[in-house]
Amino acid sequence: MKNELALKQRIAELEKLLAQKDAQIAALEERWSLAQQKQFGKSAEGFAGQGELFNEVEEIVEEVEAEQQSISYTRKKPVRKPLPKDLPREQVIHDIIDKTCDCCGGELHRMGEDKSEKLEFIPAKIKVIEHIRPKYACRHCDKSSTQTQIKQASMPAMPINKGIATSSLLSQLITSKYQYGLPLYRQEAMFKQYGIELSRQTMSSWIDKSATLFAPLVERLKAELLRQPTLFADETPLKVVKSDKVNSYMWVYCSGRDSPDPNNPIPNIVLYDFHNSRAAACVVNYLDGYQGYLHVDGYQAYARTEATLIGCWAHARRKFIDAKKLQGKNKTGKVDVVLSLIQKLYGVESRIKDKSVDDKYTARQEVSLPILSKLKIWLEQDQPNLVGNSKLIEAANYLANQWHKLIRYVDDGRLSIDNNRAERAVKPFVIGRKNWLFSQTANGAHASATLYSIVETAKINGLIPFNYICACLDELCQPEPDIDSLLPWNFKT
């Protein structure tokens, strides 16, 4: 009897262990399948929609037919875009020598011409500017042995004191690295082609000094940023060689939109802030008591701020897309219900993107709120009963935990449905990081944060970063620079 009881206990333990192993195997298989999808599958997060789940077959058929009809009428043969008219033109005439008729020998007359344009590239031109300052002295004082006075014009203020770099050269270095992701060792090789020896150490020193000059302008932009009613924030890792931490972080904060919009009262600003940690203190100290709306992902550090947090439906949707990938091809299930509803929310946003703030608020209250109610019902009814697909459980838990932040965007027409604005602002830094890989020192990372801020803010305000940085450097090296005139929306080209 005793042995039988012990045997049953042993069987129960083994069954429990087997269930744990099965769960681990299932989780590993899900991770492997998702990794395969990410590496070899489509990278887009598209979702065709599952209208039949909501008895909307007729609506979908009408949409498809309308789309097909639109395509059949609007499809055009690709046409090459004309070259800009403001580019200088150089004419090359290809004429015949013999202008007599091969048939009768008569003189040919000109009846027209064919013209085609080819785009020529002229390599960068580098020159040396010699600053000559004549010296003047008084001959009378020389002869009378009195004190000789020498007069000479003072040197104009330069970004790099006693250095050879002009504003244009510094702007070239900065835009090459921070706009186009060109590491300094490649720029060093490019200058060698012109017979100019510029070491990486020298260029790095110039970039650090330029970043110091830009610091007052970045502080002015930050003050302007923190005055806005709505902000976006995100962060991404950065390796710093001479640091005790494995990963440091570049935080990004932005306002406005990705491009100039005269109808948008909120200025377009992107600012980067480097820290050697991802602690909540980083964002708390930077925002300095900011109490407006802050669009974020689910990272808990943002909850320590005084801002009203707005959740990101793109993050929520992405988690359900991962669950959809594990569901298998041509299969439908609970994940499709959620994705279809989220797709409808984005459909509303697509239709109202050019509307006024009041119109956006009205549309969201009338159309988006009922969709959110359906999502809430799904959460309450289905989330407790989810089994199997761990990614679906993870996505549902994220949706439930972030729900109060995710639904806030419908309460104000100034708010966005997601945090894609910040994610797009992070992308140029991520692309650049793939080229130069890391920062050597924390000081270098701080300089990068400053210069990325300047380059990206110039871009989203429709400015050419090279020209803007040149003008800024010329002004910022003055004894009393006019900072307000350098704000992108005040800048005169």
Q: Where are the predicted features?
A:
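Short, flexible loop/hinge motifs at secondary-structure junctions
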Residues: 1-164, 203-204, 232-233, 260-268, ...
